[in-house]
């Protein structure tokens, strides 16, 4: 049986300053979906974000990019669930994950914030960890823990390199494919495909 997916939220920070950064890969996925499907996002004050919808009937999907900044994403998600009369299990959050290499995806039905402020805010506002999230690997700035801490902010708020762009494109394609699979397949079956996705960067000479 297909999942009851009704709302997809991409996490990120608003404004041109953050466009295309690693932290905004959730936004990038929804923007690509809009470009390919021919719809545009509009500011919805009551939802604290840019919203759109696609599909009809049982395949209708609400889309949201919170404009609250990452650390307050949960406020927009709570507002959207309330406005559309949805439950947390009908939600999918697209979120960057520094603990996953670029080129990997992880679908989970629930879980902790894992140090991600956008997920932390969402858990706080929903009052539960039980909502699906698709973690999109962006890679870590360093393997050494101390160096990683120092470079985390500049890493997540920085752009993808030219070498990484083909991988980013493949990842975004896979995210959109994964969303379609979640609409047609069970969570477990879609998750098997999503979690098995792998795109390796070409080695640099």
From Swiss-Prot:
Reaction catalysis annotation: an N-acyl-L-alpha-aminoacyl-tRNA + H2O = an N-acyl-L-amino acid + a tRNA + H(+)
Checking Gene3D superfamilies in the record gives: Peptidyl-tRNA hydrolase (3.40.50.1470)
Site (Discriminates between blocked and unblocked aminoacyl-tRNA) found at 13
Question: Where would you find this protein in the cell?
Answer: Cytoplasm
Marked site positions, Stabilizes the basic form of H active site to accept a proton? 96
- A GO molecular function held by the record: tRNA binding
Instruction: Give the primary localization class.
Output: cytoplasm
Q: Which PANTHER family match?
A: PEPTIDYL-TRNA HYDROLASE
Give the family this protein belongs to, as stated in its UniProt record: Belongs to the PTH family.
Give the protein's biological function.
Hydrolyzes ribosome-free peptidyl-tRNAs (with 1 or more amino acids incorporated), which drop off the ribosome during protein synthesis, or as a result of ribosome stalling.
Q: What is this protein called?
A: Peptidyl-tRNA hydrolase
């Amino acid at each position: 049986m297909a999942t009851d997916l009704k709302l997809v939220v991409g996490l990120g920070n608003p404004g041109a300053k953050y466009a295309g950064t690693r932290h905004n890969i959730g936004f990038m996925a929804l923007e690509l979906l809009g470009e390919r499907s021919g719809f545009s996002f509009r500011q919805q004050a009551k939802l604290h974000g840019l919203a759109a919808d696609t599909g009809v009937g049982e395949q209708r999907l609400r889309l949201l990019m919170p404009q609250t900044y990452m650390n307050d994403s949960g406020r927009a998600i709570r507002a959207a669930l309330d406005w559309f009369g949805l439950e947390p299990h009908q939600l999918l959050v697209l979120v960057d994950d520094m603990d996953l290499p670029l080129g990997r995806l992880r679908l989970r039905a629930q879980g902790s914030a894992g140090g991600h402020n956008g997920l932390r805010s969402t858990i706080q506002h929903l009052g539960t960890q039980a909502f699906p999230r698709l973690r999109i690997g962006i890679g870590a700035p360093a393997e050494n823990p101390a160096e990683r801490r120092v470079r985390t902010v500049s890493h997540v708020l920085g752009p993808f390199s030219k070498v990484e762009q083909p991988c980013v494109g493949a990842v975004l394609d896979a995210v959109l494919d994964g969303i379609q699979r979640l609409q047609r397949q069970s969570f477990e079956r879609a998750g098997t495909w999503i979690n098995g996705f792998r795109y390796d960067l070409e080695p640099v000479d």
